[in-house]
């Protein structure tokens, strides 16, 4: 299911040298993105398109069941998305409030995206990485699983709201199911749910519960593979193949393309920012 403004390029792989050349010619207003463009090409490729390494392994086999480049943003859109995530006087990025029940949630007119996942999957770390261009925004990160106990709302200018949901599984809040299920079912301005899966261990039983919830409510959602810095290329390839097969055969509402990311190396963060900006209509 494609949201307004989502650019789809079915089956077309990036011509990486051409893309990098276009990126180098693009003048972004984001100083951080300008610094990214000065990286060596191989490092830049890994940072912006982490699935490129997987593509190289799969190309000889002609795997048509994989959807590695459906979301096909232009270099200009990647830079524009970075600008949207950059805090300025005109583009305020702030923590809004927290809530334990949907009727306590702030009534915000903007499009909304939420992040859910198992305890200790790296959810808060990922959100902190997304907001790295707005360093004044405080996203609390803890090494202890189950640190997030409430729904935390962050506004990104006048564009959209990001919601950090409590983790499920170990040390989850007692009212987790009621809290999250009610939010997913009743939040009318929710545009996309981002389901985080640990790339080291893959989809777990508790993840299946969250997936079933999204499917039951007919919600558009996407799987984000976290902690790819802790996975070898071979292990990441194995997880991508297994999860892609699961998405193709077992889901209806899941976006076909996976998004591997690392909150440590920032690999995949720029592309994920662009996807968020796209599904919320912020690039229109």
Curated annotation (Swiss-Prot):
The keyword Isomerase does not apply. Disulfide bonds: none annotated. Coiled coil: none annotated. Keywords: GTP-binding, Magnesium, Metal-binding, Nucleotide-binding. HAMAP family: GTPase_EngB. Belongs to the TRAFAC class TrmE-Era-EngA-EngB-Septin-like GTPase superfamily. EngB GTPase family. This is GTP-binding protein 8. It comes from Homo sapiens. The gene is GTPBP8.
